[in-house]
Design a protein with these regions (language model features):
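Phosphate/oxyanion-binding active-site loops and adjacent basic polyanion-contact surfaces
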Residues: 32, 141-152, 200-204, 343-355
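Cytosolic-facing regulatory segments adjacent to core modules
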Residues: 93-112, 117-170, 176
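Conserved catalytic-core segment of NTP-binding enzymes
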Residues: 21, 45-48, 147-280
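Walker A/P-loop phosphate-binding motif and the immediately C-terminal alpha-helix
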Residues: 17-57
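Active-site signature of alpha/beta-hydrolase-fold catalytic machinery across serine-
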Residues: 38, 42, 64, 182
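Phosphate-binding loop that captures ATP/GTP phosphates
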Residues: 58-118, 223, 227
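C-terminal lobe/tail of nucleotide-utilizing enzymes
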Residues: 2-11, 225-369
């Protein structure tokens, strides 16, 4: 039987589209930014054109991608902000009532990987939270606010078209505010990064209560005639769940420690028994066959990524994924270097397999939709 992915390849030749993928968990400290960077790099290494979008006011993704280590780096980044647009300035025409239309952001190529670009974040992006929240609550009943709910989606679509992007990966802040609601509900797919701990279990439980409310709002907004006729129309609601990522746990003698394994199992059980019913009720799942073809069980765990340990500091220093660090960048010798190179190969395979799953799952959407 021809797989869903192979059937889509014929379709893809005739239809170029960008897939917007949100990495969302309102619990902080789950390595969303690190995963976004490493995954985006891997997708680009497989020939995809990828835009990393930093929507977290902390701007950690921007700092990693642009290498903010020294005073010279800071001066260079300041110059970039003076000469390039970013998430806040890109949306200013809508949110600050400027007499010009939203235009594509002039994204920054990320050094070291062809086809990988950054849409920089901005600390002031959070200033738009209250206004957007009011606009979404009133659902376009106030004419002056009708252009806001569709503005972020419009900016990302225009930017994707300018750079001929295959994927947009959205690094989101740990919150349940209006901006995250908008980003998630106007994405095509979403991933839920987690860590093996009690608070990730709580976060998934919370997400299962939040999603129905957000989905109901998005469906209403997508058919609201005022929002559909706005300068930046609110898009159709087509969000689908890709899966979860469990990460940042410790390995001893090739296996998760008992404590971490216990929390991994609790996360998977919470997904199966609490999140999955909500996903089904709100039509947020792809056909079951699509997940099965990728070897995913009912817990929807896409991959498990152990702690990067000392490699993460080197990765951030060189603005390079852990698996792509060179011998010169490792600056190590002997058994330490050998051990880290072995870990690099493990991480490379992990992210390669994850990227392949995402390509297959996201590509299946056009067939299953």
């Amino acid at each position: 039987m021809i797989s869903v992915f192979k059937r889509f390849q014929k379709y893809q030749k005739q239809n170029k589209m960008v897939h917007k993928i949100a990495l969302f968990n309102h619990k902080g400290g789950v390595s969303k930014t690190t995963t976004t960077f490493n995954l985006g790099w891997m997708l680009a290494s497989k020939g995809k054109r990828v835009i990393l979008v930093d929507t977290d006011p902390q701007c950690n993704l921007t700092g990693i991608a642009l290498k903010e280590e020294t005073e010279d780096d800071e001066a260079r980044i300041e110059k970039i902000y003076d000469t390039h647009s970013n998430i806040k300035t890109g949306l200013a025409p809508a949110f600050e009532s400027q007499p010009r239309a939203i235009q594509a952001v002039d994204c920054i190529p990320i050094q070291g990987q062809e086809g990988l670009f950054l849409l920089p974040g901005h600390v002031g992006f959070a200033e738009y939270e209250v206004t957007l929240g009011i606009a979404q609550e009133l659902s376009g009943s106030i004419q002056t606010l009708k252009n806001l709910p569709g503005a972020i989606s419009d900016l990302l679509e225009k930017t994707a078209n300018k750079f001929n992007a295959d994927y947009i990966l959205i690094d989101m802040s740990p919150s349940l505010g209006a901006i995250n609601q908008n980003l998630l509900m106007t994405s095509d797919f979403f991933l839920v990064p987690t860590t093996a701990d009690f608070f990730s279990v709580m976060a998934i439980d919370s997400l299962s209560r939040i999603l129905p409310k957000w989905c109901a709002w998005a469906r209403m907004a997508s058919v609201n005639h005022i929002l559909k006729e706005a300068t930046y129309p609110f898009p159709e609601f087509n969000l689908k769940f890709l899966g979860t990522i469990v990460q940042n746990y410790r390995i001893i003698r090739g296996k998760e420690t008992a404590a971490f394994q216990t929390w991994i199992e609790k996360i998977e059980n919470t997904v199966t028994h609490k999140l999955l019913p909500v996903l089904e009720q709100n039509n947020l799942l792809l056909p079951k066959q699509v997940y099965t073809e990728q070897g995913m069980s009912s817990s929807f765990t896409m991959t498990k990524i152990s702690n990067f340990n000392s490699l993460i500091a080197l990765s951030q220093e060189h603005s390079t994924p852990v698996y792509a660090l060179t011998i010169e960048q490792l600056r190590q010798t002997g058994i330490v270097r050998e051990n880290n190179q072995a870990k690099q190969e493990e991480f490379k395979k992990t992210f390669s397999d994850l990227a392949d799953k995402i390509i297959a799952l996201s590509s299946s959407y056009a067939v299953s939709a």
